[in-house]
């Protein structure tokens, strides 16, 4: 993909889409930002609000506007952050429960985008992101490396922050990844987590910390904290918007950086033909390569169990919805 004028189209002007648009402006990541929303007046208001921030930011002038699908043909990136109308999460929900109406929404958005002549990269943030990324890939017909879900970017950030707080270390010095589904079956690959260049397991033996929780406890906190945030403020937006911005920067700046995204597996971890969370090299082409971590037996079993769940849900959707 050749990128000259860096153009991003955001489909969905809710909390995530709006915060992501703000990140694009503040971080000076895009030259043109087009916002598509079912309520076009909200997209227009967001666009004006962002334009009014520009004079006080260290960013180049931008073209920011409310758009429709006729504006996507020359976009480099289309971000799907739209959410289907649904009941609130409720107590201890599963993202996969409200899947069918979300699949139909994402399918229709993808069709409209492709009918308009889009030939760039899709970034999928709508949940359940792994299943919906696969829907986008199948409906769009684009090469799989150009459809990327946010995957476990947010869980990985949460893991790094939690570990850093316990060790009183800058989270940028915590390295490792949360894998598999963006949801209840995700897990941190603790055998690969390091503090600097020191394995976390070695660090904890060398510098004992009686207040450091078990790995299972941290995994549980990572899985549950999103719901805690949602129940208190009605959404989660800053973390996932920052994750999207990080992906965007990697693409536009051709960084060849390793990020834990929802990527299409073609044999990695012994799995085929599905999207799930794994480290991948991200550059201007999208996913340049999916990386396979060396996992313990227990971690391999967790990964396999998660993929079984995702495959079951995607297969059930294919039976109910025409893709």
Swiss-Prot record:
Give the enzyme's EC designation: 1.1.1.27
Q: What's one GO-annotated cellular component? A: cytoplasm
Please give the family membership noted in the entry. Belongs to the LDH/MDH superfamily. LDH family.
UniProt-annotated binding residues for substrate: 95, 127-130, 155-158, 236
Spell out the protein name for this chain: L-lactate dehydrogenase 3
Where is this chain primarily localised?
Answer: cytoplasm
Gene encoding the protein: ldh3
**Positions with a binding annotation for NAD(+):** 16, 37, 42, 69, 125-127, 150
Could you tell me where this protein is found in the cell?
A: Cytoplasm
Q: Which residues form the active site?
A: 182
Keywords annotated in UniProt: Allosteric enzyme, Cytoplasm, NAD, Oxidoreductase
Q: In which pathway does it act?
A: Fermentation; pyruvate fermentation to lactate; (S)-lactate from pyruvate: step 1/1
């Amino acid at each position: 993909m050749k990128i000259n004028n860096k153009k991003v189209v955001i489909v969905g002007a809710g909390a995530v889409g709006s915060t992501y648009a703000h990140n694009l402006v503040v971080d000076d990541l895009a030259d043109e930002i087009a916002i598509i929303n079912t309520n076009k007046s909200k997209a227009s208001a967001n666009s004006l609000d962002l334009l009014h921030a520009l004079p006080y930011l260290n960013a180049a002038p931008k073209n920011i506007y409310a758009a429709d699908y006729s504006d996507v043909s020359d976009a480099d990136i289309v971000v799907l952050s739209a959410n289907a109308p649904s009941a609130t999460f409720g107590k201890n929900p599963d993202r996969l429960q409200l899947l069918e109406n979300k699949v139909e929404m994402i399918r229709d958005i993808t069709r409209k985008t492709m009918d308009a002549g889009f030939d760039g990269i899709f970034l999928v943030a709508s949940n359940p992101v792994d299943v919906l990324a696969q829907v986008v890939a199948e409906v769009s017909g684009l090469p799989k490396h150009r459809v990327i879900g946010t995957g476990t970017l947010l869980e990985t950030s949460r893991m790094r922050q939690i570990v850093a707080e316990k060790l009183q270390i800058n989270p940028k010095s915590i390295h490792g990844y949360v894998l598999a589904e963006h949801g209840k079956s995700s897990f941190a690959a603790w055998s690969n987590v390091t503090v600097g260049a020191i394995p976390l397991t070695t660090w904890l033996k060398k510098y004992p910390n009686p207040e450091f929780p078990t790995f299972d406890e941290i995994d549980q906190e990572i899985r549950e904290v999103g719901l805690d945030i949602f129940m208190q403020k009605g959404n989660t937006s800053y973390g996932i918007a920052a994750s999207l911005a990080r992906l965007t920067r990697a693409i536009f700046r051709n960084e060849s950086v390793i990020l834990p995204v929802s990527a299409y597996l073609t044999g990695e971890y012994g799995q085929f033909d599905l999207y799930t969370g794994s480290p991948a090299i991200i550059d201007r082409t999208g996913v340049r390569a999916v990386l396979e971590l060396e996992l313990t037996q227990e971690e391999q079993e967790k990964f396999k169990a998660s993929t079984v769940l995702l495959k079951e849900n995607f297969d059930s959707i294919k039976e109910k919805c025409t893709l």
